[in-house]
């Protein structure tokens, strides 16, 4: 069987569609500065994300992490930002095995109340590239607030930063995690450096702000609640083979 080829015109059209989508989301919604809230209040923009790939035989593979809302201040939100690797299975497997494997992404406002929405992946960049995904909710909601962005060039080593999210090691010690705003954890530290991680194309802030599995995709905010980065990874100590105290967040300019 001859493989179906995509013409150069089709490729250009698809590329322009993606560029147009990103510009539409962030040109209108990705507002810089003006957070006007403390880091604790920024929890009101954070969500828990559950991603799964499955087939009709009951087999599945799941991932989870954190996301956060973007939009115009004071208006309902419809877009969520997270890491690409948080939703990778739900996006990539259906692409590789159409009509055999299906994907689902759920955005939770409160798992305890079974309050969630099915989201559509409208932009996806894999872990080896930008490692960013944009999710679109079925309709605008007031259950979360939009977080403002801070230009990356204004962030300097020594700046205070706070990581928000749902780290698995913290949730595992709770008898009944709710995955709501009250379950969002906060860790504090400083920006150490700006670098590029091996095997990726994005720039990241190196930091001593503690993050763990489950924090992926969550916002790294400043003392005014502005998002400086997207929490993404922790370095391994090559001597011990254990996780180190060196952590990374994708700079927010990679999003805009």
Label for each model-derived stretch:
Residues 24-27, 36-39, 93, 97-106, ...:
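C-terminal cap/linker of serine protease catalytic domains
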Residues 75-127:
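Catalytic-histidine neighborhood of serine endopeptidases
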Residues 145-203, 212, 233-243:
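Flexible, gly/ser-rich surface segments that form the specificity/activation loops bordering the active-site cleft
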């Amino acid at each position: 069987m001859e493989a179906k080829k995509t013409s150069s015109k089709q490729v250009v059209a698809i590329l322009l569609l993606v560029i147009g989508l990103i510009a539409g989301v962030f040109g209108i919604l990705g507002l810089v500065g003006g957070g006007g809230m403390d880091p604790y209040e920024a929890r009101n923009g954070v969500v828990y994300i559950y991603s799964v790939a499955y087939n009709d035989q009951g087999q599945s593979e799941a991932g989870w992490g954190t996301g956060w809302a973007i939009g115009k201040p004071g208006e309902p939100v419809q877009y969520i930002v997270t890491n690409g690797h948080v939703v990778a299975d739900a996006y990539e497997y259906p692409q590789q095995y159409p009509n055999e494997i299906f994907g689902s992404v759920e955005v939770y406002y409160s798992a305890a109340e079974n309050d969630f929405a099915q989201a559509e992946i409208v932009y996806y960049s894999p872990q080896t590239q930008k490692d960013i995904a944009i999710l679109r909710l079925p309709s605008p909601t007031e259950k979360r607030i939009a977080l403002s962005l801070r230009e990356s060039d204004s962030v300097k080593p020594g700046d205070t930063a706070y990581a928000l999210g749902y780290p698995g090691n913290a949730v595992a010690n709770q008898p009944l995690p709710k995955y709501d705003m009250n379950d969002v954890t906060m860790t504090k530290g400083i920006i150490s450096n700006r670098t590029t991680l091996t095997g990726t194309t994005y720039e990241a802030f190196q930091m001593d702000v503690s993050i763990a599995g489950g924090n992926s995709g969550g916002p790294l905010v400043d003392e005014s609640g502005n998002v400086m980065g997207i929490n993404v990874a922790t370095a391994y100590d090559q001597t011990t083979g254990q996780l180190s105290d060196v952590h990374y967040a994708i700079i927010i300019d990679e999003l805009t």
